[in-house]
Amino acid sequence: MKSQVIAALVGMAVAGGVCGHALAETSLAEEEAHAIGVDAYLYFYPLVTMDVTRKQATNIEPGKVFGRGPMNMFVSVPEYPPASFRDVVRPNYDTLYSIAWIDMTNEPMIVSAPDTHGRYYLLPMLDMWSDVFASPGWRTTGTEAANYLVAPPGWTGSLPNGVIRIDAPTRFVWIIGR
């Protein structure tokens, strides 16, 4: 038993020396490490910002604060945003909104749009990088009633009849309907 412990300790010491030597050969220059840090910041910043926005917008009962409500529920705002509204950078002050955050952690979500009888509407869907990946509405899909299945990454289930599939790049999606 004692010889096995000694052999194990010697083996770890030798392996540690080998690993330490390998790490020393691959160390980064300060400029390269800084560049990697900047790239990581730029890549993850939108994800963090959108997640903070999501948590602030959905951790409340509907109707308590302008445009905010629980996950997986549209909150329709029946009045124009006030000039003091600062939840997003620049909302339109002459537009009525219906806003939803959807969580597809466990399953896809169905989003239904009514027949608007030729009236303009738009349902831009933003991923967690804040990129619009789909925008059902007057210009892209017409104004007749439609059902959309928003599928999370990797979802392979079957599509119900008459439902249009939209693949989301992230499991959380922000819909800013107008």
Segments and roles (model prediction):
Residues 7-17:
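Bacterial N-terminal signal peptides
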